[in-house]
Amino acid sequence: MLSDRGRGFQGMHYPPAFDEWCHELLCISPAAYRLFRSKFGGRTERSFHQIRSKTPIFRSSITPCAYDRARQYCSDYGYPLDGPLAIGVDDTALLEAIRPFFDPVSNKWFAIGLVGDPVEVVHDSADEFRQQLEDTGHEKAGKLRLWTLQIPLAHVPPLVIAVAAISSRTNSSTLARMDEDLLRVLMKHEEPLRIVSIGSDGAISERKARQDLIASVVSTGEGEILVRHIKHPDGRSPPITVPLLRVFGQVLTIIQDSKHCRKTLRNNLFSGARAFVLARHVTFYQQVRDITNDTARSPLHKRDVERLDRQDDRAAERLFSSATLAYTINHLEKLSLGLTVYLFVFGDLVDAYQSRNISHTERVVMVLRAKFFKDLWKAFLCEGGYPEQRYFISRDADSIVDTLVSGLLGLIFIHRDNLDQPSFPLMPWTHGSESNEHVFGLMRSLISDFTMLDVLRMVPKLTVRLQAACRSRHQQFGKTAAGYSHTYFQHDDAPPHSFTQFPSDQTIDSLAKVAYDEATYLWSLLGYDPCDVPTEPKSQPGDSVLVPFDNDSEDYDATVAISDRRELLDALEVSSHSFVPGSVSRTDKSNLNEYAFAAAALNLQDFSDLCVYNLFLAR
């Protein structure tokens, strides 16, 4: 050791990999890092502080700084600027609170936590500032909207590219305008970045925002819709269309999060308002519940079907897993054939995105099989007079499946035909909004109920945690009621060479024939012969009828439970508005002051927790 030779660690130069590892250890446990450093050396904690002080302040809203961050992100990983990049967007609950923030660049104070851009504080008096907010119509932000940028390659963490404060009443047009502003910053540049996908979950607001985005850029002439066609195998129906969006001179596709789709399809199956009629077979919740009664052989847990967490990724994965599929084949009666087919078809649809060891030709077959199966299902219901709103998946699920199908096909077309360097591998599981949920989870591990100012403090410090997650190989598949499970960074079984081989148009037409034959064969097993029925389903008069109590939407945040901090702040706000001078006793006024001090202490505690974690960017 150096100390044995009378030497210290001053002035030593450490390899970047060692520096990064020390940084990660410091984030996890400062005490453990101090012990490690006393034996093996490493930067001081103050050195990491100095490195962090050189990092630019992260700002809210869409600004030109987003391009600089994205460019530096690509440079840090040696990634070419013309390489494909993926954007993910999602939102989560935010603690409604206004906090002061000093900007050292402009040398001004701003109020953080209001919907939209930060508001400059121009009054010294709190009453005058409150009046300013009332006059301008500002409201507190109740939701955080966050965009990530992803280099879609193995073991590369995402980058938080932008955040914005919104409210639950923010409409889809406003969300679309934010997306358009970000695309303009990144793509309308002298050296534009190559965005190939923008992904989100399947919430209604997100799907509507994508539609508004397309309508906006097309109406202004900054974008156009390109349509690729695949010949329909039945020879009678119109060709399959794959829409692409050319915006700011580049082509991208709109996709949905595949894991969100899997949870939506599970929730549809568990809905008491629906019973899936698949020819001679009916599929419903009780069939899945019966599987869990076989405790000796069931691949499912009781919590997967009873008092279930609708956001549990692992439970949805277990339902559509090969183990559950094998159980339905080997241990259930033939009357459950509909359940087997449902799990097979739509489980394969998600696997087309999530599988790490299949070729793109197999993925094409899997997504097209799901499309043809769904179209034939609609045709059967129409022919039999069954209303879709009771015997088919929900409209939301139907739309999400269509977007998944066209999204994967669109990614294949873009990688094959539109990239300057067509040798870039396509890894579909890196596209979507899973990285956004991962960022939200890391934030809540630091502060369970954060304000917008907390977000601005945390975002620059998440890089090390994301890097550590990308190197982690530990996943708890059997864990129950565990919420989100993030696997987009797992690539161990991925053969990179197979992801650079894309089928030609002629091959895709042939694969469509294979997928169509498989879909028709599955329907023949179910007792329906679709050979003489057009696969383009007709609309039904009853489609517009709403079914009560059928709320399969995933557009809710599992973290919105009221925390002590939120409850305390809400109570203080109500009391401040209802306070009338002279109407409150000295004791009550003293109690209110103590509650205010407690709220301030909670805020300071959260800030000190951030400092203890020492999540500094070692760049």
Please describe what each predicted stretch is:
Residues 34-35, 86-88, 93, 148-150, ...:
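Beta-strand cores of modular interaction/reader domains in eukaryotic scaffold and signaling proteins
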Residues 86, 118-156:
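Active-site cores of enzymes that catalyze phosphoryl transfer or operate on phosphate-rich substrates
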Residues 8-9, 21-23, 32-34, 69-75, ...:
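Eukaryotic intrinsically disordered and solvent-exposed regulatory patches
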Residues 1-21:
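Basic, short loop/linker segments at the boundary and entry of helix-turn-helix/winged-helix-like folds
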Residues 136, 151-153, 157, 161, ...:
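Non-catalytic regulatory appendages
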